[in-house]
């Protein structure tokens, strides 16, 4: 289990498991452009995502890996959102302060889904708003990190296990 999951003592509720399984089926049927996502094989509360840097952005060509850590009672509570790969936009392995994250449970809506969370994260990544967990860098610094992102990710065992088709050498 992830060290970031504060609900280790609480197994996920039946509703939580049902909802997360349904959301994964939906994402599998209707993938999100520039985002890959999969639950951990050993923990339904821990999802792993990859954001593929969009063309004509400082992130172009980058591969950004991170985690969504759901609470045992999701969708009643929002997940933690973490970024593992240095992007020049977010601190690594720090909870991100977004209205769709556990930083702001008061603004969370149970109608939001994993897809909407990931789309919100992608949108926020392209923005320059400063918040807890974000950092300020130049576009040139972001471009340099984009070129180094895959080498960084290949050193991460979990990334390589969950996204082997990305981790393979070309």
Curated annotation (Swiss-Prot):
Pathway: Protein modification; protein ubiquitination. Keywords: ATP-binding, Nucleotide-binding, Transferase, Ubl conjugation pathway. Belongs to the ubiquitin-conjugating enzyme family. Its EC number is 2.3.2.23. Catalyzes the covalent attachment of ubiquitin to other proteins. SUPFAM superfamilies: UBC-like (SSF54495). It is an enzyme of class 2 (transferase). It catalyses: S-ubiquitinyl-[E1 ubiquitin-activating enzyme]-L-cysteine + [E2 ubiquitin-conjugating enzyme]-L-cysteine = [E1 ubiquitin-activating enzyme]-L-cysteine + S-ubiquitinyl-[E2 ubiquitin-conjugating enzyme]-L-cysteine. Residues 15-165 form the UBC core domain. It comes from Dictyostelium discoideum. One of its GO terms (molecular function) is ATP binding. One of its GO terms (biological process) is protein polyubiquitination. This is Ubiquitin-conjugating enzyme E2 J2-like.
């Amino acid at each position: 289990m992830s060290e970031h999951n504060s609900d280790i003592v609480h197994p996920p509720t039946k509703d939580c498991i049902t909802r997360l399984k349904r959301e994964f089926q939906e994402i599998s049927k209707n993938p999100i452009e520039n985002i890959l996502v999969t639950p951990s094989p050993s923990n339904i509360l821990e999802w792993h995502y990859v954001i593929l840097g969009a063309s004509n952005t400082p992130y172009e060509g980058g591969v950004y890996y991170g985690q969504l850590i759901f609470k045992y009672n999701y969708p009643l509570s929002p997940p933690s959102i973490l970024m593992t790969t240095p992007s020049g936009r977010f601190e690594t392995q720090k909870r991100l302060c977004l209205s769709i994250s556990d930083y702001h449970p008061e603004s969370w809506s149970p109608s939001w889904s994993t897809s909407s969370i990931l789309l919100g994260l992608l949108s926020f990544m392209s923005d320059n708003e400063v918040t807890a967990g974000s950092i300020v860098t130049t576009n040139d610094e972001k471009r340099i990190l984009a070129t180094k992102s895959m080498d960084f990710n290949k050193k991460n065992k979990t990334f390589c296990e969950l996204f082997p088709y990305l981790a393979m050498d070309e």
